[in-house]
Amino acid sequence: MLFSQIVATSRDVGATRSRKVKVGALREVLIQLEPAEVEPVVAWLSGELRQGRIGIGWRTLGDIPATPADVPAVTVSDLDGTVTAVAGISGSGSAARRRKLLADLFARTTADERDFLLRLLTGDLRQGALEGVMTDAIAAAADLPVEPVRRAFMLSGRLPATAVAAFDGGVDALTAFRLEVGRPVRPMLASPAESLTDAWTELGGDVSVEYKLDGARIQVHRNGDDVHVFTRTLREITGSVPELVELVAGLPCTSAVFDGETLALTDSGRPRPFQETMSRFGAESARDLLLHPYFFDCLHLDGVDLLDAPLEERLAALERVAPQHRIPGLIRPDSDGAATHFDDALAAGHEGVMVKSLAAPYAAGRRGRAWQKVKPEHTLDLVVLGAEWGYGRRTGYLSNLHLGARDPDGGEPIMVGKTFKGLTDALLQWQTDEFPRHERDRDDHTVYLHPDLVVEIELDGVQVSTRYPGGLALRFARVLRYRPDKTAAEADTIDAVRALLPG
């Protein structure tokens, strides 16, 4: 298949808000692929290379020919082979050899192909929250039910591998995907609750009520003496958190997978600001800042997979091996006990509580009602769509944020409001320095961004409004913090915003 067909499909998918049309366009290209083309094409249409990040930046791409080709000629095989070759180059003179291979490739690309390829190679290709749409398209193209495709993806964390299995082996190949210790699974997610009473009542009181910490999500895998730690986006951070590795290696088990949070504490035991915890995950780790783990789930223990077991059984497994590192929680409290636990969580400096169904399995990668988060104020994780230049004291700074909610059908985020409230001088400076790196377009007043950055917004409520495309507007929105641990695909949906409407 010609690479130009992939570029055209990407353009068509990005041009529509209709989930049905997106799935149809992706299916149409998938059914035309040769077996060897499935893995790279699914990766590209998901905004990544099947080889992973290969260390290519704008400096390496500085020698590409100035004039694009007139006629499409590059095939999927050509491109994938070149990327594989570039990824394998190392040693003396490697930079020059990489540039030569890429220059030869770009000399054969058209203008549209070149734009797509530049963004793909530099990690700058924004495909939106396409994972769910691509999963549906794979199922449609392979003529399979959607659910086994979704489950295989959640367990593998890799859409290209899931697609290959679907086309090569059907349902049998997909059901062969299992939880593999050492390979992260996509985390189960919670939905916001209107109140503690609503969550407790909806789940029938057969619940675990746990502290909701202001920490960073972690997934820890242990196999013998081998321990790996991953973030909520499945990025490995093992080398940055030796204290967590040492702690889990010392637990009384031979193999385990734990889900939880980690955070830094003050000398008095209260949580430090979220940004301080996240600083440990960077390349320049602040090693003097000790992280503490708080686990709330056990997905595997000593050879037994527990994903499909009810939460009550998973909590019992966690209690057997890590009782001192469990997140504070109550099993089947009455309504008064749940309320007291909520108050205790807030008094300890935490965000609120999670209310979880004790009967629910672990729905990897899914956001449902089996887990509900309760906070004292409404908060939403929204996508930053742009920022306006400030005036007065904020002249010269990017200030007023344009905020969008995720489209559950995989379209572009839907704008629901603006705010500059809550922005400190430090955040204003950071935005002004950082936002141009994500710039999509600009005019005299506003810098428009690719949907990369997620910000946590506190608000008093939501009202119906014709001012924004979603028909909703945030009331008294203010910035709490940025969420570098979250992608746009994990932002709250327009449905979650709509659920906050009164009545």
Swiss-Prot record:
The keyword Phosphoprotein does not apply. Pfam families: DNA_ligase_A_C, DNA_ligase_A_M, DNA_ligase_A_N. GO terms for biological process: cell division; DNA biosynthetic process; DNA recombination; DNA repair; DNA replication. GO terms for molecular function: ATP binding; DNA binding; DNA ligase (ATP) activity; metal ion binding. It is an enzyme of class 6 (ligase). ATP binds at E210, R217, R232, E261, F296, R367, K373. It catalyses: ATP + (deoxyribonucleotide)n-3'-hydroxyl + 5'-phospho-(deoxyribonucleotide)m = (deoxyribonucleotide)n+m + AMP + diphosphate. DNA ligase that seals nicks in double-stranded DNA during DNA replication, DNA recombination and DNA repair. NCBIfam families: dnl1, PRK03180.1. This is Probable DNA ligase. It comes from Rhodococcus jostii (strain RHA1). The gene is lig.
